[in-house]
Amino acid sequence: MKKSITILAGGGPAPGINTVIASVAKVFLKEGFRVIGMHQGYKGLFSHKPDTIEFDFAFCDKIMNVGGSALQMSRHKPKNEEFKTDFFVNNNVKLLVTIGGDDTASTANRISKFLAENHVSIQNIHVPKTIDNDLPLPEGTPTFGYQTAKETGASIAATVYEDARTSGNWFVVSAMGREAGHLAFGIGASCHYPMIIIPEMFNETRISIEKIIKLMISSIIKRKILGIDYGAVIISEGVFHFLTNTEIEATEINFTYDDHGHPELGNVSKAHIFNMLLQKKLKELKVSVKSRPVEIGYELRCVTPSAFDLLYCSLLGIGVHTLFNEGKTGCMVTSNPGGDIIPLYLKDVEDENGKVKPRLVNIQSQKTQLVFRNNLHFIHENDYEAAKQYLENPEDYDFLKILNWD
């Protein structure tokens, strides 16, 4: 029977998935392999009748530079009792290529172990994907899709900023980011937003809604002192991962709840929440400022990949073939800034519980500190006297004091 490889994608979309799929498929087709695409991720792989597509060169050439995913994706995480050998044996699968985040990679390792125990030998190689840029790749190596999402996000954010200038309003912008603030920071820094709020900046104090609102007001008042009546704040949605349910519920926003009793944050606009809370506080302070919410999220996930990600994803796809020929398995494929293909093993980035720790924004790096201390607008000691016309206690809105930074 002809040897084959199987490709599946898990989690949510990111620009460049089709480029990875096409690049992997082309190089294996060239060597005479069947290339089978699996719809619905792991849910499809272990279903009674998997929904598959067999790739040929013409189809790969068609999807290579297109956004979205030719393979329908799924967040399904199968239990061990769902595993079966049928599909792998019946199709003579020699390699399972998974595209996704850390959960997708960990599941691939579990499957590989199960197959080995049942005398079915295959390799599995993972292509790390997320627009959040939070997988623990080597320093300076982005996750694919991040650069495109940042570029598209910056275009939207720049338009929003121009609207603020034109209308004399403020905008509260929320950007995707599961726990890390890479996307919000990258977009905000690119557009010179006067306030950027990400989870990592609270490295010396606990994150709270009160502090987030004070940081926004600090920027608004500083701009008033400078004679600027407009602006924009960008907040990473990741801040919500560090708030308690009690504090989230205290916002008085109407939430739906999951089976575990947790507020379903995915059903509401984080920008709307923070804008409502900001307006409430501004009214208490008798500060007249109009603000509007803007959510930047799903618009970024299926856009056409940028030139950076087109090349990067092509290298990752070809890199899968390179690692396969080297006999590598149970690893992620990475490409360093020089274009070299390097395997990264999950065991080297997992904690003692087998969980992959997210890569956070390095808040102490020179790049980050340059942006926070020089590009943002906020109240500091020299502004106290001028700020008293708006705030009774300007010191409470001092950026450095709120964060407990030196």
Question: Where do the model's predicted regions map?
Answer:
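Short, ordered loop/turn segments at secondary-structure junctions
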Residues: 10-12, 33, 38-43, 75-76, ...
